[in-house]
Curated annotation (Swiss-Prot):
This is Deoxyuridine 5'-triphosphate nucleotidohydrolase. Transmembrane segments: none annotated. It holds the Pfam family dUTPase. The keyword NAD does not apply. The gene is dut. Its cofactor is Mg(2+). SUPFAM superfamilies: dUTPase-like. This enzyme is involved in nucleotide metabolism: it produces dUMP, the immediate precursor of thymidine nucleotides and it decreases the intracellular concentration of dUTP so that uracil cannot be incorporated into DNA. It comes from Pasteurella multocida (strain Pm70).
Length: 151
């Protein structure tokens, strides 16, 4: 299994806050925590940037990382990512921030250390483009947006 070196900027991680871990052997994502100095309220409709205390430099161009919402926050509280998915390229070297959007009608309180998103590493395939006059025919052809049926 490939390992990636993740640098931790916030000295509270590992002392006041646990190191990020995978919850189970089959977990794809690591939980990202709100490393804020005091609790904060995200008002209805508001989007805020929240530091995670982590910095990341993947370096390997065959890998990237994505920041994804936590399903329970979105379903139960209307808390999702302001950019829907955060993409971390292999050559990015900065701190990880989470854009948190309260799409509900109620204020939402973020406590210091709350788990607010998850980080997943993914393989990268870069496309090479070739201009052609047509494609080989398939059974589906150009059909889209429900063309293959409902059931």
């Amino acid at each position: 299994m490939k390992k990636i070196d993740v640098k931790i900027l916030d000295q509270r991680i590992g002392t006041e806050f646990p190191l990020p871990t995978y919850a189970t052997e089959g977990s794809a994502g690591l939980d990202l925590r709100a490393l804020i100095d005091a609790p904060m309220t995200v008002e209805a409709g508001q989007t805020v940037l929240i530091p995670t205390g982590l910095s990341l430099y993947i370096a390997d161009p065959t890998l990237a990382a994505v920041i994804l919402p936590r399903s329970g926050l979105g379903h139960k509280h209307g808390i999702v990512l302001g950019n829907l998915v955060g993409l971390i390229d292999s050559d990015y070297q900065g701190p990880l921030m989470v854009s948190l959007w309260n799409r509900s009608t109620e204020p939402f309180k973020v406590e210091v250390g709350d788990r607010i998103a998850q980080l997943v590493f993914v393989p990268v395939v870069q496309a090479e483009f070739n201009v052609v006059s047509d494609f080989a025919q398939t059974e589906r052809g150009e059909g889209g947006f429900g063309h293959s049926g409902k059931q």
